[in-house]
C-alpha cells in the first residue's frame, strides 16, 4: 500500500484487484487475435511481405499489454471524511475528488470478462461530468458494499445541506 501526502497527512491508498490486469489482457488478446490471424492467412496465401505486418501487430500487442499492466497498477482510491478520491495514471496522472454531497447515484457494472474474474467497476455520477468518476477492478462484493456506503454518505451529506 502506497502513501501520499494529501491535506498534510499520509493516507493509505487502496489498490484495485490484480484480476483487472488479467481481464484487460484477455480483452486485448481477443481484440488483436483477428488482425493477427488475418495477416497470417494473407501472408501464407498471397505474399510473404505481410509477415512484416504480422510482426508489427505482435509487437504492438506486447507493448500495449505492458502498458495495461503498468496502468492498472497506478489505479487506487481512498475514502476521506468529506470526499471519495480516485487516482489513476503513471504518465498522464489524474486525481478526481468527489464530494459525498454531490453524489447523485452510484452504479456497479460488470461485463462478461470482468464477471469471469469476479470484478466490477464502480461508476459515481454527480451533476458535473468533471467530478464524476469510474473505479474499475473492484471485487464484486467490495463494489456492492462501497456502492451502498457511498449512496448512504451522499444522502446524509445532501440532507445536511
Model-assigned labels for residue ranges:
Residues 1-161:
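N-terminal basic, Ser/Thr-rich segments that initiate or prime the first beta/alpha elements at protein or domain
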Amino acid at each position: 500500500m502506497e502513501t501520499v501526502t494529501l491535506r498534510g497527512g499520509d493516507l493509505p491508498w487502496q489498490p484495485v484487484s490484480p484480476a483487472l490486469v488479467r481481464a484487460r489482457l484477455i480483452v486485448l488478446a481477443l481484440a488483436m487475435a483477428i488482425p493477427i490471424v488475418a495477416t497470417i492467412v494473407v501472408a501464407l496465401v498471397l505474399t510473404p511481405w505481410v509477415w512484416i505486418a504480422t510482426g508489427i501487430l505482435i509487437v504492438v500487442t506486447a507493448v500495449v499489454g505492458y502498458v495495461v499492466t503498468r496502468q492498472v497498477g497506478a489505479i487506487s482510491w481512498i475514502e476521506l471524511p468529506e470526499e471519495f478520491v480516485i487516482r489513476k495514471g503513471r504518465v498522464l496522472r489524474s486525481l478526481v475528488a468527489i464530494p459525498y454531497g454531490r453524489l447523485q447515484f452510484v452504479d456497479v457494472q460488470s461485463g462478461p470478462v470482468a464477471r469471469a474474474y469476479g470484478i466490477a467497476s464502480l461508476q459515481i455520477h454527480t451533476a458535473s461530468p468533471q467530478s464524476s468518476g469510474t473505479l474499475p477492478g473492484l471485487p464484486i462484493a467490495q463494489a456492492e458494499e462501497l456502492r451502498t456506503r457511498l449512496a448512504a454518505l451522499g444522502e446524509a451529506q445532501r440532507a445536511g445541506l
